[in-house]
């Protein structure tokens, strides 16, 4: 084997990293271009730059003539999952889900395109998602006249966004990003004094040690993604960003939102999620906690044409008020 083909990380069928720094992403869904008035849902979407490092796909549900002058829409900022190292806000796997979520919730969607590991190891994704959230918040109290002065602002958010109903969401590592963003939002102010009303953590990615044999596999594949994404993490897999129950972890009572929906599915991660929920309850956090315990698998949520997937989306969107 040539030295250039020597691998340092190989997790088929998803990703392979070579000693010379090359990365092969072996499994990615197709890119979906921007579009207006999707024939299936009526949703429109476009891609916008936020900075030289961060961009986002913004979604607008179908707006009737009557709704043009009615109350504004909730804002849903989403951080996608896939191991911190795979997929994209612009690819069909997460795009299709968000399109249907936005249509069902009647909300503006902002799906963040953050930098991926291992080329950009953590905490890059955390910083990118915080920057994207601050950009969204910077639109508060603006009107269309602001667009002439600020070329980096988006008219959909200005015209239709209700900043009293700002929500975050994320799946798996995206749910972990939500966790870390909420902790930061509890300490630092968002632009314009905007507050996060609620957040959804679907299948949140944590590495909390359990006594369950069912969770033994966490020592292997599940932990590999963290080691790939943050190889120099202080404390390794006991870093507070991935294990919120370690001794030096930030106080969960400082979560910067008023409402939280945590979703579990029927697999080995359920025990870990239950431990996190227990820690959150014991912390004294004053918000409203809702738990969705699905008798389904992780990927069922993203099968948007099935009844199971549709029902899961309805359950999650019912949280957006």
UniProtKB/Swiss-Prot annotation:
InterPro entries in the record: AB_hydrolase_3 (IPR013094), AB_hydrolase_fold (IPR029058), Carboxylest/Gibb_receptor (IPR050466)
Catalytic residue list: 172, 267
Reaction catalysed by this enzyme: dihydroprecondylocarpine acetate + NADPH = (+)-vincadifformine + acetate + NADP(+)
The EC number(s) this enzyme carries: 4.-.-.-
Keyword annotations of the record: Alkaloid metabolism, Lyase
Cystines in this chain: none
GO molecular function: hydrolase activity; lyase activity
Motif (Involved in the stabilization of the negatively charged intermediate by the formation of the oxyanion hole) on chain: 80-82
Pathway assigned to this chain's UniProt record: Alkaloid biosynthesis
Domain of life: Eukaryota
GO terms of biological process kind: alkaloid metabolic process
Keyword Lyase attributed: yes
SUPFAM superfamilies in UniProt: alpha/beta-Hydrolases
Protein family (similarity comment): Belongs to the 'GDXG' lipolytic enzyme family.
Function field: Component of the seco-iridoid and derivatives monoterpenoid indole alkaloids (MIAs, e.g. vincadifformine) biosynthesis pathway. Catalyzes the conversion of O-acetylstemmadenine (OAS) to vincadifformine. May also trigger the formation of additional unknown MIAs.
Protein name per Swiss-Prot or TrEMBL: Hydrolase 3
């Amino acid at each position: 084997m040539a030295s250039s083909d020597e691998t340092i990380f190989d997790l088929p069928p998803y990703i392979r990293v070579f000693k010379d720094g090359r990365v092969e992403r072996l499994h990615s869904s197709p890119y979906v271009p921007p579009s207006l008035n999707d024939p299936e849902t009526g949703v429109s979407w476009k891609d916008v730059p936020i900075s030289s490092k961060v961009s986002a796909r913004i979604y607008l549900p179908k707006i009737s003539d009557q709704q043009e002058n009615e109350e504004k829409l909730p804002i849903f900022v989403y951080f996608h999952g896939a191991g911190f190292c795979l997929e994209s806000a612009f690819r069909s796997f997460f795009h299709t889900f968000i399109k249907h979520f936005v249509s069902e919730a009647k909300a503006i969607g902002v799906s963040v395109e953050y930098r991926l590991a291992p080329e950009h190891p953590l905490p890059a994704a955390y910083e990118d998602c915080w920057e994207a959230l601050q950009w969204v918040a910077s639109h508060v109290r603006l009107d269309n006249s602001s667009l002439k002065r600020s070329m980096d602002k988006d008219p959909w958010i200005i015209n239709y966004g209700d900043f009293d109903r700002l929500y975050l969401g994320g799946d798996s590592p995206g749910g972990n990003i939500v966790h870390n963003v909420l902790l930061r939002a509890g300490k630092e102010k968002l632009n314009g004094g905007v507050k996060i009303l609620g957040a959804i953590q679907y299948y949140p990615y944590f590495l909390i040690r359990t006594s369950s044999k069912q969770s033994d596999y966490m020592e292997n594949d599940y932990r590999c993604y963290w080691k790939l994404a943050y190889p120099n993490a202080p404390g390794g897999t006991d870093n507070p960003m991935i294990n919120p129950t370690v001794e030096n972890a930030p106080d969960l009572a400082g979560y910067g939102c008023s409402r939280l929906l945590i979703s579990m599915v029927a697999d080995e991660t359920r025990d870990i999620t239950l431990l996190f929920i227990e820690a959150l309850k014991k912390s004294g956090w004053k918000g409203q906690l809702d738990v969705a315990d699905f008798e389904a698998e992780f990927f069922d949520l993203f099968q948007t044409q099935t009844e199971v997937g549709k029902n899961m989306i309805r359950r999650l969107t019912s949280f957006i008020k």
